[in-house]
Amino acid sequence: MKYLKIISMLTAAAVLAAVLTCVGFYQYLENGDGNFSREVPAAEQQLRLRLVTAAKQWLGTQEASVSHAQILEIYNLHEPLAQGYEVKLEDNWCAAFASAVAISCNLTDIVPTECGCERQVGLWMDIGRWEENEKYQPLPGDYIYYAWDDNWKFGNCTGWADHVGIVVGTAGPFIKVIEGNKDDQVAYRIIFRHHPEIRGYGLPDFGSKNQ
């Protein structure tokens, strides 16, 4: 009986330590941008951070504001315009925002532009830069897609991609993301890396820009 109590106490302590560690990682991301989950070449790291910095310049932009209109203008003026469709102020605009960031950085050769998330996922697949392995550890500058209607199903998320953001950084089990059209603004999201509604990642080939 004595040993069972000791084991129970040790288990509780381990759980508490794990919880506190996760809380620490979460707070770290709230106060900063996080880290690269693995080492990448310096030139690639610089390019990834340039994309993230460009996205962060729009942080706080409210829907239907002047800045929102400017984001859509960047997207709509790009040629070729995906689907030949100009995004309106009343449209969902997360993919248009993520595309506009790439356009502003002259990275459309490695980031396919689209105003629809599921179509953009298809474009990543077409160029062989789509990743949906749950073990993948994202890097700053990766594009993260969600299927919010997947209803927390266990196993591989295969639902319809209906939202997208750009990875800012990681810490422990969490990812920090910047997103357009999050609660009708450009804002951060901190999400568990193994969240069941993460559809997958579009991976810009930053390395090819340094060859």
Give, region by region, the residue ranges found by the protein language model.
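Solvent-exposed, flexible loop/coil residues
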Residues: Y75-E79, I127-R129, E134, V186, ...
